[in-house]
From Swiss-Prot:
Subcellular location: Cytoplasm; Nucleus
Main location: cytoplasm
Swiss-Prot/TrEMBL keywords: Cytoplasm, mRNA processing, mRNA splicing, Nucleus, Ribonucleoprotein, RNA-binding, rRNA processing, Spliceosome, tRNA processing
Listed InterPro entries: Lsm6/sSmF, LSM_dom_sf, Sm, Sm_dom_euk/arc
Protein name per the record: Probable U6 snRNA-associated Sm-like protein LSm6
CC terms in the record's Gene Ontology section: nucleolus; P-body; sno(s)RNA-containing ribonucleoprotein complex; spliceosomal complex; U4/U6 x U5 tri-snRNP complex; U6 snRNP
Function: Component of LSm protein complexes, which are involved in RNA processing and may function in a chaperone-like manner, facilitating the efficient association of RNA processing factors with their substrates. Component of the cytoplasmic LSM1-LSM7 complex, which is thought to be involved in mRNA degradation by activating the decapping step in the 5'-to-3' mRNA decay pathway. Component of the nuclear LSM2-LSM8 complex, which is involved in splicing of nuclear mRNAs.
Known partners and oligomeric status: Component of the heptameric LSM1-LSM7 complex, which consists of LSM1, LSM2, LSM3, LSM4, LSM5, LSM6 and LSM7. Component of the heptameric LSM2-LSM8 complex, which consists of LSM2, LSM3, LSM4, LSM5, LSM6, LSM7 and LSM8. The LSm subunits form a seven-membered ring structure with a doughnut shape.
One Pfam entry name: LSM
A GO MF label: RNA binding
Record organism: Dictyostelium discoideum
Phylogenetic placement of the source organism: Eukaryota, Amoebozoa, Evosea, Eumycetozoa, Dictyostelia
Family statement drawn from the similarity comment of this UniProt entry: Belongs to the snRNP Sm proteins family. SmF/LSm6 subfamily.
GO-annotated biological processes: maturation of SSU-rRNA; mRNA splicing, via spliceosome; tRNA processing
Length: 88
């Protein structure tokens, strides 16, 4: 099952988003940025500003693998969505 959350500034969604992120720590996720680039890897940390730390990260552009990173930091204001992926 794939679960997706979008960024939102409303306080009603804060608890649901926090619970979603807590559930995703240590799991594979896809993070899509506003510019269309996707990062796929293991979610390690996410903070209240949507800043994200991932491990085993791969960068995709137009569905094609561009680069592999060990660790990756994504600034929250660039995040369009985070999608939890099934465990492999």
């Amino acid at each position: 099952m794939t679960t997706t959350t979008t960024t939102s500034n409303t306080s009603n969604n804060s608890n649901a988003q926090f619970n979603f992120f807590k559930m995703c720590i240590g799991r594979p996720v896809v993070v899509k940025l506003n510019n269309g680039v996707e990062y796929r890897g293991i979610l390690e940390v996410v903070d209240g500003n949507m800043n994200i730390v991932m491990e085993q990260t791969e960068e995709y552009l137009n569905g094609q693998l561009k680069t592999k990173y060990g660790d990756c930091f994504l600034r929250g204001n660039n995040v369009l969505y985070i999608s939890a992926q099934p465990r492999k």
